[in-house]
């Protein structure tokens, strides 16, 4: 059993690179204690690195090696040596050396040496790191995963049993060695796969040889049938020639008779086409035609010309009125714009005045606050220390005051900018209101910039909105008339434009004709939809009949397959009898004869297998090949008896001559030779008896062959009928499907055209209705202004104003919220600064108190002078700041005087604007009356023009209808003339002659095609017979012999595959049993450890549970049991429970899987444990130690910082324990101590 003896560490983490530290491990317990950061975990990392070669977690970049910057060197070498005893009792040493070099911009880490050697006779084995890594687990008798995850588990990974499911699965799979057993199983499967692939290849070869054998038989049959077919086709070609000559003579006679009637037929064809076109027009216009008298009167009338002249005259008058109205509108627009400009100036002046008042008030408040701040002065008549403290406080207050004043000054500047922006914004709003007549809408959108900047700009506009609210009533009364007139003019212009657009679209469109056409198209659409449904029903019926026919064909195929299988089974029985007599069952029942032995059997019976006429049963329903000459005797039971007799006699002669078994070449003793002769002679007698009994079986075969022949006839008849039916059905379905598809496509196109026409007609009708509605609106708007419409417009402006006001209110609330939040943040920052200042003051006082005893009187005086000079500088800066503030106040007073002058100018401008507005209001009423008269006159003239236009349109429609009616009557007369001319000509006799000629032509073409097919068939058959004969001579010389050899090889490979399958199943079952038994063993140990360790009553015990997610694939999880209920421990356990569970699971796994290496290292096992659980854990470990006390190789390594835990474990443990500490240079040291409290002294105190 393997064990570890000593460990030497140098240049690893905190251990010095100059001197080595040695640690000796005891049995059964080695205790290592030390404070945090002294290098306890480094011991576990070194053991793990020495045994597995893997570095600890998070050690990239050379963190595992002593830092070169700390050592003051460019390169540092770390070395770990381990003295241990392997599983064979040999003393071994493993040494690993690693180097870390500090370059200019990076660090380089590389392994210098990894060596393992034995101390016996100086023998050593050294090699690369990978060789040592693979060899160390073999010396310890466990796998590398057990060393990493159980024996020397790192502290950061100590709770892996309760970690991520993926990590738990990987580690437990490595511990159970699932991959190793899986590789063995995969190797067997790979062998089985290769064997199966060989079987498939041989089966393909066998299938190819079988087809070659069948090909040979088929070629012989085709040669015979080809010769007979050629003779039959020659007779049929001669009959076709005679019939073709007779048809040509009759066609010549018909052509002579048809040549005299060719002109009359052409004339009749032209008349029929003309008749069809005329009838289409007559049928389409029959319902809309006018009586002949009415149409004649309409065509000769002159009222249309007079109406057109009146329409042109009225249209010119309307255009002149419209030009006069446009001139008045332009003059009125210029007046409204000038009035709006005056209103804008007045509003701007009033708003600016209000802003100046507000700014003046805010400045007065700011000045008062500044004066109150500047008056804060105190006399400084205290001692130097008191003066210093007060000046510091006063300076802080002055800084805050200066900061507030700067903010106030910035705010005032911003207010000036805001007033300028507000005035420009008001001017823009007034300009927009003045442009209502041309635009017809008001743009009330507001753009915002940044979050707080935009909101503060909105608050400035809020003052503007308050001013607007006071003057909104007067402003609206002045703008109501202009706004309502502009709005109505804009709407009327839109309606007129829409009217002109609709009139253009409806020009030449007859509404009544469109409606009638729409009804006809809908009727056609419904008719075509019904026709499409009928076609779909017909197609579904055809599909049902096709399904019934396919079912009947399937039934016939099943009957044919049944009879074929019955005949094939008889041939199979005859084959099996031959193979049993040849000794092939020895290959199947035992493994003594291999594939090579089977080949030798074939070679020894080469004369038997080389026969071309050798057969293993009938596989084709070809009765001619079964009853033709010698083949009947060869395929009968009598020929089987002859073959068996011949084989038995040859085997008997070979065996007596060579005294060996002719099948497996085994030497025969005298007793075996006598028994061999007896069996072969008995076989010869059975073969002779079989010749007589074969005649009876042949009679049975004749009966079955008769049934097969009858069934073949029935099948041939049915196939012929089925082929004819299929040909007719395919032809019929092709024609019907083509016609049906064409009809459906045509109907779909017609339906789309009709639907498009319907949509277009409905759109035109909607346009006409919209035109009537617009006319009504225009007439209603021209009768007078509506008070309700004006009121709605005012309400719209008020609604826009309210929305704007609500939006400003929301922005103001948002600003208030942000300001409050900013104030809270500022208060928190000030509090933190005060706290920091207080802490700094406390620390300064403490430093002063600690150093006061050592400071001389001169130092104190120097400090006082320095403080006084600092105080003077602060007072000087304060005086300069006060002068600057007083100058700022003087500037504010100057600005206030300028604002007073500006207010006086604004008042003068207000008085002038009021006088101008009173003079212009008197002229406005006169212009409105004149404008209304011009507008009513224009509307009246346009209505008259519209009425005359509608009258002319109706007259044009009646005239076009009269023209179409005259065409109708003329074409009706022409139709009667064509019908009379067609009735005088007799076409029945000519049609009969043409039909007869067409049938003769078809018959002639069919006979010619049949003749060509027969000649081509004869030629192809002759070529085929020739090629068949050449193929028989060239490719089928040894076909049957090769088939028999391949058949034996396939059987031998199949037996090998069966043996591999049994081996795979046995190994698979063994893997599952091993996994189950080991897991039960681990859980039993884990239950015992938990019940004796854990002191809580919330968990009865824990166990590792597996869930199979596939074949040999397991998912693991740790569950705890409470009252018979299992719960997943991950996510439901405390940190202490995780630590106890992880330690106990490692103990249980080590007990089951590390029997060859009874070493276990526990790093800080008391982490997160309370006192009771620490004591119970110590008790459990003591029990484990006492249980393995007789085992000299059991070693438990415990690393902890808990002195009480060390005392609990040392009660029955070793006499010594190790304590880790730091030297004055910061390097870790290992010192051995006695459990009785004395430190071991001597030359080897540091190991």
UniProtKB/Swiss-Prot annotation:
Residues given in the record as ATP binding sites: 13, 36-37, 39-42, 63, 65, 67, 155
Enzyme class, spelled out: hydrolase
The record lists Mg(2+) as bound by 41, 155
User: Where would you say this protein principally sits, based on its record?
Assistant: nucleus
| Residues that span the membrane, as ranges | none
* Coiled coil, from the record: 299-415, 459-545, 787-942, 972-1020
Give the family this protein belongs to, as stated in its UniProt record.
Belongs to the SMC family. RAD50 subfamily.
Domain comment? The zinc-hook, which separates the large intramolecular coiled coil regions, contains 2 Cys residues that coordinate one molecule of zinc with the help of the 2 Cys residues of the zinc-hook of another RAD50 molecule, thereby forming a V-shaped homodimer. The two heads of the homodimer, which constitute the ATP-binding domain, interact with the MRE11 homodimer.
The name under which this protein is listed is: DNA repair protein RAD50
State the species of origin.
Encephalitozoon cuniculi (strain GB-M1)
UniProt lists the gene as RAD50
């Amino acid at each position: 059993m393997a064990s570890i003896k000593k460990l030497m560490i140098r240049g690893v983490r905190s251990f010095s690179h100059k001197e080595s530290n040695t640690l000796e491990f005891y049995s059964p317990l080695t205790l290592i204690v030390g404070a945090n950061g002294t290098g306890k975990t480094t011991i576990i990392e070194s053991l793990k690195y020495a045994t597995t070669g893997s570095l600890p977690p998070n050690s990239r970049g050379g963190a595992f090696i002593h830092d070169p910057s700390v050592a003051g060197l460019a390169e540092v070498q770390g070395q770990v040596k381990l003295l241990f005893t392997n599983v064979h009792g040999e003393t071994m040493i493993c040494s690993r050396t690693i180097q870390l070099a500090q370059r200019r911009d990076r660090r380089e880490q590389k392994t210098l040496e990894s060596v393992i050697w034995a101390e016996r006779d100086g023998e050593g084995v050294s090699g690369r790191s990978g060789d040592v890594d693979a060899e160390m687990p073999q010396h310890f008798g466990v796998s590398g995963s057990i060393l990493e995850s159980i024996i020397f588990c790192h502290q950061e990974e100590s709770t892996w049993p309760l970690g991520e499911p993926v990590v738990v699965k990987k580690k437990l799979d490595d511990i159970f060695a699932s991959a190793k057993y899986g590789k063995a199983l995969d190797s067997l499967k790979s062998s089985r796969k290769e064997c199966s692939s060989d079987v498939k290849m041989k089966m393909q070869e066998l299938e190819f040889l079988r087809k070659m054998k069948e090909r040979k038989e088929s070629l012989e049959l085709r040669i015979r049938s080809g010769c007979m077919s050629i003779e039959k086709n020659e007779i049929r070609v001669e009959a076709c020639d005679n019939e073709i000559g007779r048809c040509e003579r009759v066609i010549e006679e018909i052509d002579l008779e048809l040549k005299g009637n060719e002109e009359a037929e052409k004339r009749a064809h032209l008349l029929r086409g003309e008749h069809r076109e005329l009838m289409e027009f007559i049928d389409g216009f029959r319902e809309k035609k006018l009586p002949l008298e009415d149409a004649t009167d309409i065509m000769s009338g002159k009222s249309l010309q007079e109406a057109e002249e009146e329409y042109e005259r009225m249209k010119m008058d309307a255009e002149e009125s419209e030009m006069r109205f446009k001139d008045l509108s332009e003059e009125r627009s210029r007046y409204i714009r000038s009035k709006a400009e005056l209103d804008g100036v007045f509003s701007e002046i009033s708003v600016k005045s209000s802003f100046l008042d507000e700014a003046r008030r805010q400045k007065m408040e700011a000045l008062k606050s500044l004066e109150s701040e500047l008056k804060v002065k105190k006399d400084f008549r205290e001692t130097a220390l008191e003066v210093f403290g007060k000046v510091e406080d006063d300076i802080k207050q002055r800084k805050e005051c200066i900061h507030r004043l700067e903010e106030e000054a910035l705010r005032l500047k911003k207010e000036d900018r805001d007033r300028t922006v507000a005035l420009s914004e008001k001017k823009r709003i007034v300009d927009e209101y003045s442009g209502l007549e041309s635009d017809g809408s008001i743009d009330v959108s507001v753009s915002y910039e940044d979050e707080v900047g935009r909101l503060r700009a909105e608050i400035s506009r809020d003052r503007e909105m308050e001013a607007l609210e006071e003057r909104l009533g007067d402003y609206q009364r002045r703008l109501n008339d202009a706004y309502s007139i502009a709005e109505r003019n804009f709407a009327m212009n839109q309606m007129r434009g829409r009217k002109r657009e609709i009139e253009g679209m409806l020009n030449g469109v007859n509404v009544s004709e469109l409606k009638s056409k729409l009804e006809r198209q809908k009727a056609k659409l419904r008719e075509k939809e019904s026709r499409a449904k009928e076609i779909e029903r017909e197609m579904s019926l055809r599909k049902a009949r096709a399904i019934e026919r396919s079912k009947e064909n399937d039934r016939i195929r099943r009957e044919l397959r049944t009879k074929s299988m019955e005949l094939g089974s008889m041939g199979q029985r005859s084959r099996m009898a031959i193979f049993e007599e040849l000794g092939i069952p020895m290959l199947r029942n035992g493994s003594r004869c291999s594939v090579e032995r089977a080949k030798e059997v074939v070679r020894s019976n080469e004369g038997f297998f080389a026969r071309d006429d050798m057969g293993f049963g009938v596989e084709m329903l070809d009765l001619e090949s079964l009853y033709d000459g010698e083949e009947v005797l060869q395929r009968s039971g009598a020929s089987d008896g002859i073959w068996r007799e011949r084989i038995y006699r040859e085997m008997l002669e070979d065996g007596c001559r060579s005294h060996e078994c002719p099948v497996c070449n085994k030497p025969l003793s005298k007793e075996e030779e006598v028994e061999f002769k007896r069996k072969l002679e008995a076989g010869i007698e059975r073969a002779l008896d079989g010749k007589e009994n074969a005649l009876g079986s042949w009679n049975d075969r004749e009966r079955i062959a008769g049934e097969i022949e009858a069934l073949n006839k029935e099948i041939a008849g049915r196939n012929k009928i089925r082929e004819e039916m299929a040909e007719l059905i395919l032809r019929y379905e092709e024609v019907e499907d083509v016609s049906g598809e064409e009809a459906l496509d045509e109907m779909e196109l017609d339906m789309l055209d009709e639907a498009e026409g319907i949509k277009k007609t409905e759109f035109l009708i909607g346009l006409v209705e919209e035109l009537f509605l617009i006319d009504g609106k225009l007439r209603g708007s021209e009768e007078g202004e509506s008070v309700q419409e004006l009121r709605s417009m005012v309400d719209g402006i008020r609604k826009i104003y309210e929305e704007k006001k609500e939006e400003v209110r929301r922005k103001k609330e948002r600003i208030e919220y942000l300001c409050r939040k900013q104030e809270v943040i500022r208060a928190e920052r000030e509090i933190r600064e005060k706290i920091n200042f207080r802490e700094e003051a406390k620390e300064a006082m403490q430093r002063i108190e600690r150093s006061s005893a050592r400071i001389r009187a001169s130092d104190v005086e120097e400090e006082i002078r320095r403080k006084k000079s600092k105080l003077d500088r602060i007072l000087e800066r304060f005086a300069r700041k006060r002068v600057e503030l007083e100058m700022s106040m003087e500037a504010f007073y100057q600005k206030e005087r300028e604002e007073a002058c500006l207010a006086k100018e604004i008042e003068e401008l207000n008085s002038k604007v009021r006088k101008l507005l009173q003079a212009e209001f008197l002229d406005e009423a006169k212009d409105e009356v004149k404008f209304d008269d011009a507008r009513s006159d224009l509307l009246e003239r346009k209505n008259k023009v519209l009425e005359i236009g509608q009258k002319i349109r109706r007259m044009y429609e009646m005239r076009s209808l009269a023209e179409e009616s005259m065409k109708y009557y003329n074409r009706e007369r022409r139709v009667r003339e064509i019908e009379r001319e067609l009735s005088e000509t007799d076409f029945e006799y000519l049609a009969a002659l043409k039909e007869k000629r067409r049938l003769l032509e078809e018959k002639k073409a069919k006979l010619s095609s049949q003749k060509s097919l027969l000649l081509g068939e004869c030629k192809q058959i002759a070529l085929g017979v020739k090629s068949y004969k050449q193929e028989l001579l060239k490719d089928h010389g040894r076909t049957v012999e090769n088939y028999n050899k391949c058949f034996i090889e396939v059987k031998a490979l199949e037996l090998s595959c069966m043996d591999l399958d049994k081996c795979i199943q046995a190994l698979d079952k063994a893997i599952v049993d091993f996994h189950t038994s080991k897991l039960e063993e681990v859980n039993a140990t884990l239950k015992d450890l938990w019940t004796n360790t854990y002191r809580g009553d919330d968990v009865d015990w824990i166990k590792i549970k597996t869930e199979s997610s596939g074949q040999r694939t397991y998912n693991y999880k740790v569950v705890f049991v409470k009252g018979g209920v299992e719960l997943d421990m991950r996510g439901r356990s405390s940190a202490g429970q995780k630590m106890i569970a992880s330690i106990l699971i490692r103990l249980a796994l080590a007990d089951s899987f590390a029997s060859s290496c009874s070493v276990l290292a526990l790093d800080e096992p008391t982490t997160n444990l309370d006192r009771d659980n620490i004591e119970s854990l110590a008790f459990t470990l003591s029990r484990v130690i006492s249980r393995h006390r007789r085992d000299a190789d059991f070693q438990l390594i415990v690393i902890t910082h808990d002195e009480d835990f060390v005392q609990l474990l040392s009660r029955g443990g070793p006499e010594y324990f190790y304590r880790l500490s730091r030297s004055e240079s910061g390097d870790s040291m290992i010192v051995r101590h006695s459990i009785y409290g004395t430190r071991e002294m001597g030359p080897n105190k540091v190991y």
